[in-house]
Structures are given as C-alpha cells and as structure tokens.
C-alpha cells in the first residue's frame, strides 16, 4: 500500500479507510477471513477485495453501510491511532505552504509522535526528496517505524534520538535540510544543533510548533541568538463552512404561514378555556389498538425541482479552540 500513488481496486493486504461518519474514520488492513464490526453492521474483508476505492459497501445483513476510501495523509490524520497530540490539517497545510515544501525538498522533523505530519511531508517531497524524522520515546519510535514501513514511505528515515542533547547528525548521511519542523517541549535546546545539518547552499526555513506563549518567547530568543531571521509567529484559527440550499418562499407562502400560526393560537386558546378533557381530540380516530395519530406533513427534499432554491452557506458559530503557536524563521547560509 503506497501513499504516493492511487490504485483503483482493493487487494488483500491493502490499507482501507472506512468512512463511517464525518467524525468517524477507521483504518482497516484487509485480510481474508476477517470481519470489521461497527454499530451499523459488520463488513467482511473477503467482500472488500476486488471492490473499487470510494465504493459504498453494504453491511453483511443488508443494513448499514460504509465507504471504502483510499488512504491519504489528510484522512490518515483523522483515523490513525493517537500516541501523542497530532498536527491537524489546518496547521499542517499552512506549514507546508509557508515553508515552501515541494518535490525534492529535504525535511528535518523532530518529534515524530504519531507520524501524522511525517506522512504529509513524505507525500509532498515525493521520492525525489527526503524526510529525516526523530523520536526520543522508544515505544513511539518503534510504532512509527513499523507504520512508515507498512505504508512504503521509502523516502523517510526515522531515528531514535533525543535531538535536544544529541543533535541531528546521522552517520554516513549528508542531511543538508532546507526545511525544519520542531514539535518539541523545548525547541530552544535543539536549535543550536541545526547548523551542522541544514543546507549550506540555500536558505533554510524553520517552524516550531508550541502550545504555550512562554515556549514561544524562549524559542524566539534561541532563534535570534543562533542567526535565524524574519521571525514571525502565526496562529491558525479554522472554522468549518457548510453549503446547502434554502427554499425561496413567496409572499403568498408567508401569508399562508401567518394564517396557520394565528389559527393554531386561536385553537389553542379555545382548548385552554375549555379545560382538560378525558376525550381525545376529534381528529384522532379510535382503532382496536388505541387511537390513530395524525399523519406527519410531507417532507420536501432539498433541491426538489418543483420548488425554487437559493444556494447558501453557514459557518460554525465559534472558531475552533487554540492548538498551537507556529513560529517561523529562515536562515541564509554564510558566503
């Protein structure tokens, strides 16, 4: 299974992302004989084999369904097993654009964590580039190494290292990084070690991902002391926008609605004046099994051609809460 190329059909051993709902995406490693269980039904791996990526798969018992999606770094971010707090797409996409990460870039990442952002870097630099990622926590390092190998991210080298104390150098490897991303509790301790591994032929860009403003203060001082310039702090605030159609109402519709409301109020007042009654309302028909409730009004499907519609958008009422401060800087090599 590769994150670099798309394929049409699912095969045994492939990674499939099961889209259950907007907030629930689950990774599946397809194996013959296994079953994926959800509250919406169960889904046999055997039947996934040969299906197209993007297809809707019905449940084995005829109810419920999931969509079988091809993995991308963005979808993987929403579905991966979290070992640490991760960098989500609103931040990661801005960082990649701001640092001008492109095919052929050489990226230094410290703080692999769940390897979410590592996937985005690897996909962006392509096989012509290189990602060097470092993780000091051994269990997280081993899990991330296993995932990167399974996903065939051959342009990525992961190293078990505390870069704050031991630096970034790798034996028999010329790193020459032109992009640096530090997701560390104390990036100011790692910054002095960068001079030996960043590019000596072109400018290098850096982004430090820090939740607290106190961390930003110390990071900025370390950047200035080590010759980094054009320092800027950014906070990304994202809101989700939804698109839908609103039915256009005529004046006659509005007048009719007002009449219905007025009649409803009048009827309600009359019932209140009469006081409680043991008899059910006249419009309820008695049957052998009790009283028959009135039918619900007909629901109009959005976009129905028998009505006039207007395209509309709506944003979330509140901006998502703070994730982290992004501290950017660049360093030009000495001539």
From Swiss-Prot:
Domain of life assignment: Eukaryota
Q: Which Gene3D superfamilies match?
A: 3.10.330.20, Vaccinia Virus protein VP39 (3.40.50.150)
Which keywords does UniProt give here? Methyltransferase, Nucleus, S-adenosyl-L-methionine, Transferase, tRNA processing
| Methyltransferase found in the keyword field | yes
Record: residues binding S-adenosyl-L-methionine: 114-116, 135, 140, 162-163, 183
What family does this belong to? Belongs to the class I-like SAM-binding methyltransferase superfamily. TRM61 family.
The identity of this protein, by name, is tRNA (adenine(58)-N(1))-methyltransferase catalytic subunit TRM61
Q: Which organism is it from?
A: Candida albicans (strain SC5314 / ATCC MYA-2876) (Yeast)
The gene from which this protein is expressed is TRM61
């Amino acid at each position: 299974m590769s994150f670099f190329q798309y394929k049409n059909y699912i095969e045994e051993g492939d990674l499939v992302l099961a889209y259950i709902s907007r907030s629930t995406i689950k990774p599946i490693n397809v194996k013959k004989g296994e079953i994926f269980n959800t509250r919406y039904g169960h889904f046999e791996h055997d039947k996934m084999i040969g299906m197209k990526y993007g297809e809707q798969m019905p449940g084995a018992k005829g109810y419920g369904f999931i969509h079988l999606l091809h993995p991308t770094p963005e979808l993987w971010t929403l579905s991966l097993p979290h070992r640490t707090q991760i960098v989500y797409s609103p931040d990661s996409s801005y960082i990649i654009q701001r640092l001008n990460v492109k095919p052929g870039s050489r990226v230094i990442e410290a703080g692999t964590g769940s390897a979410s952002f590592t996937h985005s870097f690897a996909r962006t630099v392509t096989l012509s580039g290189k990602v060097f990622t470092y993780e000091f926590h051994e269990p997280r390092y081993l899990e991330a190494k296993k995932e990167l190998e399974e996903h065939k991210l051959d342009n990525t080298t992961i190293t078990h290292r505390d870069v704050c104390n031991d630096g970034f150098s790798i034996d028999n490897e010329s790193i020459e990084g032109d992009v640096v991303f530090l997701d560390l509790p104390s990036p100011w301790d790692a910054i002095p070690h960068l001079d030996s591994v960043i590019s000596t032929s072109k400018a290098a860009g850096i982004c430090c991902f820090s939740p607290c403003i106190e961390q930003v203060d110390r990071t900025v001082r370390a950047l200035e002391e080590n010759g980094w310039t054009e320092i800027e702090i950014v906070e990304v605030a994202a809101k989700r926008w939804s698109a839908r159609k609103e039915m256009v109402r005529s004046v006659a519709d509005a007048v009719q609605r007002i009449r219905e409301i007025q009649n409803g109020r009048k009827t309600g007042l009359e019932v209140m004046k009469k006081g409680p009654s043991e008899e059910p309302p006249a419009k309820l028909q008695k049957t052998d099994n009790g009283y028959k409730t009135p039918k619900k009004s007909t629901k109009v499907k959005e976009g129905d051609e028998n009505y006039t519609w207007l395209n509309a958008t709506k944003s979330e009422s509140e901006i998502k809460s703070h994730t982290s401060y992004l501290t950017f800087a660049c360093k030009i090599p000495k001539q």
